[in-house]
UniProtKB/Swiss-Prot annotation:
Ribonucleoprotein is among the record's keywords: yes
Stretches for region Disordered: 21-41
MF annotations from Gene Ontology: rRNA binding; structural constituent of ribosome
Full protein name: Large ribosomal subunit protein uL15
One Pfam family it belongs to: Ribosomal_L27A
Keywords: Ribonucleoprotein, Ribosomal protein, RNA-binding, rRNA-binding
Length: 153
């Protein structure tokens, strides 16, 4: 037996049916799409149509609303500021503002549209006396900063 004498078993590989290639092929002329109509045309898919049964979007109830005046916050934690201080990206002597945090990469805030809120998750001790000027603070974050001798502007 040689490599050029290897063949697939009979029936192991079957050519797929070529549709719409003449009436002699068995799937010619309309190519299994029926005659005329929207669904026989190319590029047509009726979105949300489930074959006549009531579609899912109609079966589920309407719920809630989107409040226009909701404030959207970028959340940062005290440990994010601690890391930036340790890296040297921020200095404890300066007032830390939203713009400064965006500049050093602590906050990703395109066009300064979102507000910045400081939380104290995973931080029970904070030693640096900082002066911060952000949009909002959690009560625990306020306590930690004021206990360390910092100021909230």
């Amino acid at each position: 037996m040689k490599l050029n004498e290897l063949y697939n078993n009979i029936g192991a590989k079957k050519n797929k049916k070529r549709i719409a290639r003449g009436i002699g092929s068995g799937k010619g002329k309309t190519g299994g799409r029926g005659i005329k109509g929207q669904k026989s045309r190319s590029g047509v898919a009726i979105k949300g149509f489930e074959g006549g049964q009531t579609p899912m979007i109609k079966r589920l109830p309407k719920r809630g609303f989107n409040c226009i005046s909701t404030k959207k916050y970028n959340i940062i934690n005290i440990y994010n500021i601690e890391e930036a201080l340790a890296d040297g990206r921020l200095s404890a002597a300066d007032t830390i503002t939203k713009e400064k945090l965006v500049e050093v990469g602590v906050v990703n805030n395109k066009n300064n549209k979102k507000l910045v809120k400081l939380l104290s998750i995973c931080s029970d001790d904070f030693a640096s006396p900082l002066s911060l000027k952000l949009d909002a603070y959690s009560s625990k974050a306020k306590d930690l900063i004021e206990k360390a001798g910092g100021k909230l502007l």
